[in-house]
């Protein structure tokens, strides 16, 4: 299973029909396939090894796809053209109306779909997207072509709060969650110290009674 990247996106367009198209796709089959579709030939080929008997045919299909689309399979296409390997959608959290656009909240596999944002931006969409991947400790803000990316591995909660933009930090509770982890870790270390002290005291008492 992949690490999941949390995303919060505001998306706007001057054409209301394009906004409705986003809503329908996001709440339905998937947003990225609607606007940046994976060619059918790439979707119908295995991204990986195949049985020996099928290798020759598989290689021919891969070469055809590479020459035609620039990619041999759906996985390579999605990672490069979308920025993530799977499509994104509501998954129980439908698009919300905001003045002039929509607010989208979703998880994406391993990374935010910034490559897709670039293509949507070229179609006339205005996009401000915040993302947060706790497993690899990175977060950022993609704002109409500019990507402010932050890595916070090894930082304290205080350092994170000082480094990340306030809106980004508060949107996902990043420094707050790290502060909770720090408090839990400190409590565990304190309990270990108490146990060790208790063990030493018991040993000393036994020695004195001999």
Feature locations, PLM:
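Long, contiguous binding/interaction regions
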Residues: 1-209
């Amino acid at each position: 299973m992949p690490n999941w990247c949390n995303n919060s996106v505001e998306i706007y367009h001057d054409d209301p029909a394009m906004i409705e198209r986003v809503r329908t796709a996001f709440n339905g089959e998937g947003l990225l396939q609607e606007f940046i579709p994976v060619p059918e030939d790439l979707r119908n080929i295995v991204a990986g090894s195949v049985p020996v008997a099928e290798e020759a045919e598989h290689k021919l299909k891969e070469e055809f796809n590479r020459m035609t689309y620039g990619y041999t399979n759906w996985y390579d296409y999605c990672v490069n053209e979308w920025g993530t390997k799977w499509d994104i959608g509501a998954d129980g959290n439908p698009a919300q109306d905001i003045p002039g656009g929509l607010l989208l909240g979703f998880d994406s596999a391993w990374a935010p779909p910034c490559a897709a944002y670039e293509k949507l931006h070229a179609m006339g969409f205005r996009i401000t997207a915040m993302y947060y991947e706790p497993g690899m400790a990175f977060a950022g803000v993609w704002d109409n072509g500019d990507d402010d990316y932050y890595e916070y591995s090894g930082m304290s909660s205080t350092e994170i709060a000082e480094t990340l933009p306030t809106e980004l930090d508060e949107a996902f509770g990043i420094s707050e969650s790290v502060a909770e982890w720090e408090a839990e870790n400190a409590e565990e270390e304190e309990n270990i110290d108490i146990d060790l002290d208790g063990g030493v005291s018991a040993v000393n008492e036994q020695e004195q009674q001999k």
